[in-house]
Amino acid sequence: MTNELFGVCPFVTAQKLLQGKWAILILHALNEGTKRFNDLERDIQITHATLSSQLKYMEKEGLVHRTVYPEVPPRVEYSLTAMGRRFAPVLDSIQVWGEEYIEFLKENRI
């Protein structure tokens, strides 16, 4: 997506970055701090292949930073970039809205 959306509606840009059901959950997990691949895989309950694909995409788009340590066995950690961290207030708003919506569903038995 990099550069192909230059000059397009910001909502379209955000939608394309966050498409799929895992992007927000990955951002939420990394917003809590640096994580290893297996930690993300376990915490989010996502398949290895899907997580790998999503992290590569998010790294390419500048939201996630991947750090490889020269150790044996290799250690790789993922964290949010400065741009990824700028999404934190949006995550907070989504969480508040989600909590309110859950209460709405309970009250209205939907």
Enumerate the predicted regions with their spans.
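Short, intrinsically disordered or compositionally biased N-terminal tails of bacterial proteins
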Residues: 1-2
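Canonical helix-turn-helix DNA-binding module
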Residues: 37-69, 73
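N-terminal helix-turn-helix DNA-binding core of bacterial DNA-binding proteins
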Residues: 5-50, 77
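Amphipathic alpha-helical dimerization/coiled-coil segments
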Residues: 28, 85-110
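Basic, amphipathic "hinge/linker" alpha-helix immediately C-terminal to the N-terminal HTH DNA-binding motif
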Residues: 70-94
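Residue-level detector of alpha-helical hydrophobic segments embedded in or interacting with membranes
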Residues: 5, 65-69, 84
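Generic structural signal for secondary-structure transition and capping sites
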Residues: 23, 35, 63, 96-99
